[in-house]
Amino acid sequence: MSATYSIGRLEHANLTVSDPDRSAALFRELCGWHERWRGASQMGGWTIHVGSNDSYVALYTNEGRGGPYTKGQPLNHLGIEVDDLAAAEAVVATAGLQPFGHDDYVPGRRFYFFDWDGIEFEVVSYALPTT
């Protein structure tokens, strides 16, 4: 039996954060992304979309919910590819976040960090080191 598949791509991820403006500023600086949209969300609360022309991260908050938002707890981390790992790490540290788990492996290099809401990110570069 033969099946026909379309080629998929990740169009967006939706993250619940405590301060969408703060998170959007981090991603603009870290990834060179731009704000694509902001406004009230369908489920109440507020959302900012930040990303490239092809994909984005929706940064959602519902201030009236109270307490941590538990949907999606199985998420391990989101990976972000950058050209300059050292510059990316400087952005993360300047934001007051703690990079950890540095590793050089084939075919790249990486580090991790948790944002202000406990969401883990992996920052990876496949560019050849300049030193």
Where are these regions (language model features)?
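Vicinal oxygen chelate
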Residues: M1-S6, R38, A93-T131
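Short amphipathic alpha-helices in soluble, non-transmembrane regions
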Residues: E29-L30, V91-A95
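Conserved beta-strand in the GNAT
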Residues: A58-Y60, E122
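Short, charged/polar surface micro-motifs in flexible loops or helix N-caps
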Residues: N53-V57, G64-G66, L85-A87
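Mid-chain, well-packed structural core segment of small domains
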Residues: K71, L78-V92
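Core segments of cupin and vicinal oxygen chelate
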Residues: I7, N14-Y56
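N-terminal beta-strand motif that seeds the catalytic metal site of vicinal oxygen chelate
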Residues: M1-R22, L75-I80, A127-T131
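Exposed loop/turn and edge beta-strand positions of beta-sandwich/beta-sheet ligand-binding modules
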Residues: G44, P74, P107
